Amino acid sequence: MASGVAVSDGVIKVFNDMKVRKSSTPEEVKKRKKAVLFCLSEDKKNIILEEGKEILVGDVGQTVDDPYATFVKMLPDKDCRYALYDATYETKESKKEDLVFIFWAPECAPLKSKMIYASSKDAIKKKLTGIKHELQANCYEEVKDRCTLAEKLGGSAVISLEGKPL
């Protein structure tokens, strides 16, 4: 069921910037987004970038010690969100980076919000082409343990996430 909600150009631009890892200067790398939240506009007609809800690559190791824990704290208690998280992880063979699409729908979110976000999920996923991993979570218990995300990224082959052993 489609909701008729449109995906803003800003969302697509952020996604493309996060997806493309072209050779960049160290300053450009620092400005790249590590994690972002997307929300519905006030009129509920567009999916937009949520102001101030982002982690930059340059913040990691500076103002952000653990980007995954910081990301989890950005999720609202009582409303839904979409998110993109640029996961850095290690398997037994190599280090990897992958974008993860996250649909956050906490159980205490208003029913109308859950319905609009759920019915708009396909619209945003169609615009974010090439995402290999998706995580849907309905409570903090499902996201606060980094093993949940590691499971989506590669199961038991993943040995660390964001430099923290599992």
From Swiss-Prot:
Sequence positions bearing N6-acetyllysine:
K13, K73, K144
Instruction: Tell me the ranges covered by the ADF-H domain, including all copies.
Output: 4-153
The cross-link described as Glycyl lysine isopeptide (Lys-Gly) (interchain with G-Cter in SUMO2) comes at K132
Instruction: Give all Phosphoserine modified positions.
Output: S3, S8, S41, S156
Expression tissues: Widely distributed in various tissues.
Q: What does the entry's PTM section describe?
A: Inactivated by phosphorylation on Ser-3. Phosphorylated on Ser-3 in resting cells. Dephosphorylated by PDXP/chronophin; this restores its activity in promoting actin filament depolymerization. The phosphorylation of Ser-24 may prevent recognition of the nuclear localization signal. Phosphorylated via a ARRB1-RAC1-LIMK1-PAK1 cascade upon active ligand stimulation of atypical chemokine receptor ACKR2.
The short sequence motif called Nuclear localization signal sits at 30-34
* Membrane-topology annotation of the record: Peripheral membrane protein
What are the UniProt keywords, alphabetically?
Acetylation, Actin-binding, Cell membrane, Cell projection, Cytoplasm, Cytoskeleton, Isopeptide bond, Membrane, Nucleus, Phosphoprotein, Ubl conjugation
Q: Which residues carry this modification: Phosphotyrosine?
A: Y68, Y140
Q: Does the keyword Nucleus apply?
A: yes
- Modified positions (N-acetylalanine) in chain numbering: A2
Q: Which GO terms describe its cellular component?
A: actin cytoskeleton; cytoplasm; growth cone; lamellipodium; lamellipodium membrane; nuclear matrix; ruffle membrane
Indicate where this protein resides in the cell.
Nucleus matrix; Cytoplasm, Cytoskeleton; Cell projection, Ruffle membrane; Cell projection, Lamellipodium membrane
Recorded GO MF terms: actin filament binding
The cross-references to InterPro entries, in alphabetical order and at most eight, read:
ADF-H (IPR002108), ADF-H/Gelsolin-like_dom_sf (IPR029006), ADF/Cofilin (IPR017904)
Q: Which GO terms describe its biological process?
A: actin filament fragmentation; actin filament organization; actin filament severing; cytoskeleton organization; establishment of spindle localization; mitotic cytokinesis; positive regulation of embryonic development; regulation of cell morphogenesis
* Quaternary assembly: Can bind G- and F-actin in a 1:1 ratio of cofilin to actin. It is a major component of intranuclear and cytoplasmic actin rods. Interacts with the subcortical maternal complex (SCMC) via interaction with TLE6 and NLRP5. Interacts with C9orf72.
Report the sequence similarity comment from the record. Answer: Belongs to the actin-binding proteins ADF family.
Task: Please explain the role this protein plays, according to its UniProt record.
Answer: Binds to F-actin and exhibits pH-sensitive F-actin depolymerizing activity. In conjunction with the subcortical maternal complex (SCMC), plays an essential role for zygotes to progress beyond the first embryonic cell divisions via regulation of actin dynamics. Required for the centralization of the mitotic spindle and symmetric division of zygotes. Plays a role in the regulation of cell morphology and cytoskeletal organization in epithelial cells.
Name of this chain's protein: Cofilin-1
For this protein's source organism, the top of the classification is: Eukaryota, Metazoa, Chordata, Craniata, Vertebrata
